[in-house]
Each structure stands twice: as structure tokens, then as C-alpha cells.
């Protein structure tokens, strides 16, 4: 008798949890992307010398691309993203930058020039500044978000003065980012 009552209670619990799961709406892509972005930005070892991009596919697969300075960052970020509700799998295509004293020196010089410029002081005071400086084999990529096109051009101008082989400017303005998010 006790076993029968237990089985009935278990069946009721399972059926009610299945019904509850059916009532919960599926999370929207924008919500999931915002949660993934929050996880990456709050990762304490994510710096201005790293850049990670996120693409969320319809099946809940999160595709991570970009470049980080240390191998453990790639693994940690992949694990953090995998814990986000709405992410079914993580495809971690983040590349690890090679170790190079020349690249390190270039990173520090460019970051001092950009964040030391009075036009960018308000960014430098942020916990996670929005301009990311990725240096790979002497080639610089500026990524992130700035307020307007003038700041984008100034950042590029400051980055070109330190002997980099090339400077690729992938900075986006607030307006461009807003437009991109509205398409989601």
C-alpha cells in the first residue's frame, strides 16, 4: 500500500513538473545573448587585451569566437557560457594568442595611448573598458564599442603610432550596436 502511494505521488510529481515545463516560455535569443555577454564581461580575467564574440544559433548552440591571451581563459569562458540558461551546447572557437614580448609591449603602449587620452578617460574609469586591443604577431585589431565615429577614428589614429605592422579597426558605434540588436 505504501509503495503504491509512493509511486502515485512520484507519477503526480513527474506529470506536474512536465506540465510546468511546458508552461515556461522558451527564452528569447536576446535574453540568452545578454546573459552570455554578462557572464563573459564579469569573468575577472577578461581584459582589454581579449576579445570574444558570441553567436547564438536557433538550436541553442552558442558559438564563441575571438582571441584571448591565455589558454585557461578560453576554457573558463566556455564553461561559464555553458551554464547560461537557454544554451544547449557551446562551440568554443576562441583562439589563444601566441606569447610574444613585442606583442605585449605593443599592447601596453597602445592601451596607454588610448586610455590615457582625455577623450577616452571616461572609458578608462569603467570596470571593463569597451575598447579591446588585440595584438597578434605585430598586427593590431581594435574591437568593441565607442560613442561615435570621431572616437573610432581617434582610437585608430592613436594605435597606429607605435610601429604595428597593421591596424584593423573593428570598433562599432553605439548607434551601430543598437541597430544590430534591434535586428535580433
Question: What are these regions, as identified by a protein language model?
Answer:
Residues 2-8, 14-184:
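N-terminal targeting leaders
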Amino acid at each position: 500500500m505504501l509503495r503504491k502511494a509512493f509511486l502515485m505521488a512520484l507519477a503526480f510529481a513527474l506529470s506536474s513538473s512536465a506540465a510546468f515545463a511546458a508552461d515556461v516560455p522558451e527564452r528569447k535569443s536576446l535574453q540568452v545573448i545578454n546573459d552570455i555577454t554578462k557572464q563573459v564581461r564579469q569573468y575577472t580575467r577578461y581584459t582589454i587585451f581579449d576579445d570574444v564574440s558570441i553567436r547564438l544559433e536557433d538550436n541553442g548552440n552558442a558559438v564563441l569566437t575571438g582571441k584571448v591571451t591565455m589558454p585557461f581563459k578560453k576554457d573558463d569562458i566556455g564553461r561559464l557560457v555553458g551554464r547560461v540558461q537557454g544554451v544547449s551546447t557551446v562551440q568554443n572557437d576562441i583562439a589563444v594568442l601566441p606569447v610574444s614580448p613585442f606583442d605585449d609591449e605593443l599592447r601596453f603602449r597602445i592601451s596607454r595611448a588610448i586610455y590615457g587620452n582625455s577623450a577616452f578617460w571616461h572609458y578608462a574609469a569603467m570596470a571593463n573598458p569597451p575598447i579591446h586591443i588585440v595584438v597578434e604577431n605585430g598586427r593590431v585589431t581594435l574591437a568593441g564599442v565607442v560613442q561615435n565615429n570621431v572616437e573610432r577614428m581617434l582610437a585608430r589614429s592613436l594605435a597606429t603610432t607605435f610601429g604595428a605592422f597593421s591596424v584593423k579597426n573593428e570598433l562599432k558605434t553605439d548607434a551601430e550596436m543598437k541597430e544590430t540588436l534591434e535586428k535580433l
